[in-house]
Amino acid sequence: MNKIYLPASKMQDLETIIKESWELKVRLNQLSLDERKIIVLSGDHGVGKDVWAKLMKTKNPEIEIIRFADPLREAFEKAGIPGHSIDSLKRTCFKFSEFKVDGYQLDGMTMREALVHVAESNKVKFGQDYYAKQAIERAQKALEYSKLIVFTDMRFLVENKAVQDFAKANNLYIVRINIPEGLPKIEVLQD
């Protein structure tokens, strides 16, 4: 897949982005809900996998977006840090002071360090497939009302295996799309 180039002045309007990006328009129009399938979005950190998923969902609202990190983000939200703050704080040097998530002390850690610490601690405590199992449970429930499930953050072999096993058990076809660098950040779609 080629890089997507859009004029900076038009990066805020979803309809304009879809209209002006031939490649994006073609990809979105190729989404067929005739058969049940899984789309796995891959790409470097920060290239816009979640943005692509949201664009797909805008085009086809029946799509279910699942992130392996959702339970981790929900744990931080329960502790008082909303999702949009998580993303903002990851880009800063902010460090926690007297803060706990899921019982883990995060003093002196940046947001990224805290996310990794809680995730890895939970994997040690509950098994390496802790987050994969939760994502697959959500995907199984989503099959009751959706033919297309999009995973946006597959990072580990255990997650890949879980998705493959899930697809095989449910007779689903897996499509992998690599998101190129250069997809603009669309603030309208950010959490």
Question: Could you tell me what each predicted segment is?
Answer:
Residues 2-39:
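Extreme N-terminal, non-catalytic leader segments
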Residues 43-44:
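P-loop (Walker A) phosphate-binding loop of NTP-binding proteins
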Residues 49:
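Conserved lysine of the Walker
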Residues 52:
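Hydrophobic positions on the alpha1 helix immediately C-terminal to the Walker A/P-loop
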Residues 58-65:
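Post-Walker A helix-loop "phosphate-sensing" segment adjacent to the P-loop in P-loop NTPases
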Residues 64, 134-187:
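ATP-dependent NMP and nucleoside kinases share a basic, alpha-helical "lid"
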Residues 70-146:
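ATP-dependent small-molecule kinase phosphotransfer cores
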Residues 75-77, 182-191:
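Short, charged, surface-exposed secondary-structure boundary motifs
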